[in-house]
Amino acid sequence: MERSSVEKAAATPNPTPGENKNKNTTSNSKKQRPGPCGWLREHRVSLLTRHKRRLVEVPYTATIADTANALQANCVSAMVVAAPPGRWIGAGGTMILESDPATGAVRKHYIGMVTMLDILVHIAEAGVKGGGKWEEMDLNQSMMVPVSSVIGHSLEGLSLWTLNPNTSIMDCMETFSKGVHRALVPIGSQTDNSLPVELVESSPGYKMVTQMDVIRFLQESSHELKDILSSSIQALDAINENVFAVAKNTKVDEVIKTMRAASLTAVPVVDADGVELLQDGRGKRVVETFSASDLRDCPMAQLQSWLGLTVTEFKEKVGALKATLTPEGGTAISDVQQSPKLITSFPENSLKEVTEMVVVNHVHRVWVVDRQSLLLGLVSLTDILRAVRESALKMDQDMQGIVSQ
């Protein structure tokens, strides 16, 4: 027989005050969302590589010319170099191996990474050995040496990094905020308690994760980091004021030597004369960007004859050449692979706006200017990741301080 509502109430024991408190605590904990720091720790590096292609590589016997062509064909600025196992010491003492998925036998050893900057440095050194007379230098012969001979020409090539796929985005950002631009991530790793950065690794295959991948992830998840990304780059101390520039009438060969000497991957081109090849760019009007990737866009057949051009002339010729070419699919290269535009920001722009600039335009740095378009500094991908990470840590520390009071 159906009990009355009074009987039901009497049959139901009243919760004690302690039980009410526990229920409220449980309910609140379910509703409480993690802060930026906790959210970045919850997400893993494997999320960044989910839709990425397998590693693009070149054999250690490939020539520098072959490598430059491969970089251009794949629209990348760096490739790993593979060699037979047991013959080489990996860059930085690393042992990054690829094994057969069926037998586990090691079949490749990744001995290092070669970037466009390495090739740029090699070209610069060839020019120095040739007495600085580029028109008399046999560039073709210099480009026929094995790519293994240029590993480590730039600081980035001196080491090869791997990240465990279970590494948190937060730990990944710590590595990338220190100037590491890219790292290999093993496919199918089941290790949960591995160190974030590995020196020894063996896997059936790898994918590459870059600073840009992390920036793109942050930009797509901006609602989770709105308290950080809504702040200005000036307030977040994300602007690097140490910016070196070259004048627009500087010749490409001189710029290459200058970038090599200063270990720079890119320089702003400013509207100035000056007697110094590399000058303080602050307070000057920026008109162009010249980077190691610009050499990737220049066909090897034209490179030597174009080294004597000014930076602006070189950029114009490369842009005009690409506009006349059509890859498979019928789309003009000018529509899909044009050299990056000159991207600038004001100090008061939010970090969200700057991340959108680098993602949409696929550039690795944004020049910061004042209202008169005079250069104040730059914000690189490294600066963005450092600013987000430090802000997330500070917010977490502030929250811990409030809770402990």
What are these regions (language model features)?
Residues 1-405:
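Tandem CBS (Cystathionine beta-synthase) repeat/Bateman regulatory domains
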